[in-house]
């Protein structure tokens, strides 16, 4: 298995693109919140099978409290994001919803600097600006 973060990030992007297309079709005839529930159940089953099959299960009692807290917060943010995303897909075109959703990249860059102490150079900030501009051009015009 590849240990390259770039490989996994590109794979994530490819699956995220498929997610937008599949989700747009999937929410066409049902409530977007219920569609999110179905998606979540599928993800839970698949990830549980992967963790079990690869022997990656960990004892919950051995996981530090801080880890539980931040994973719970991440889960809540993910759920809110998915609910909003599916509602947006129900109401709008996938080709316009997905780029606007990807403004999360811009927000992550800002939050990373503000809260995680990460550093971005001038070229990085230029890239962030281009992503923001591109997302807005795709979604608004």
Swiss-Prot record:
It is found in: Cell membrane. InterPro entries: EamA_dom. Pfam families: EamA. It is a multi-pass membrane protein. Keywords: Cell membrane, Membrane, Transmembrane, Transmembrane helix, Transport. Belongs to the EamA transporter family. The chain crosses the membrane at residues 7-27, 34-54, 69-89, 97-117, 121-141. Disulfide bonds: none annotated. This is Uncharacterized transporter in cobO 3'region. The keyword Cell membrane applies. GO terms for cellular component: plasma membrane. The keyword Cell cycle does not apply. Gene3D superfamilies: 1.10.3730.20. Residues 14-140 form the EamA domain. SUPFAM superfamilies: Multidrug resistance efflux transporter EmrE (SSF103481).
């Amino acid at each position: 298995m590849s240990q390259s973060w770039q490989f996994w990030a590109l794979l994530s992007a490819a699956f995220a693109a498929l997610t937008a297309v599949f989700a747009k079709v999937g929410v066409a005839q049902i409530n977007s919140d219920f569609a999110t529930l179905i998606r979540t159940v599928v993800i839970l089953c698949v990830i549980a099978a992967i963790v079990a099959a690869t022997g990656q299960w960990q004892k919950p009692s051995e996981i530090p409290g801080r880890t539980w807290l931040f994973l719970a917060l991440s889960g809540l943010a993910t759920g809110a994001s998915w609910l909003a995303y599916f509602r947006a897909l129900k109401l709008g075109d996938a080709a316009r919803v997905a780029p606007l959703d990807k403004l999360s990249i811009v927000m992550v860059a800002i939050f990373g600097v503000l809260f995680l102490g990460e550093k971005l150079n001038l070229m990085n900030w230029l890239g962030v600006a281009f992503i923001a501009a591109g997302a807005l051009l795709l979604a608004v015009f």
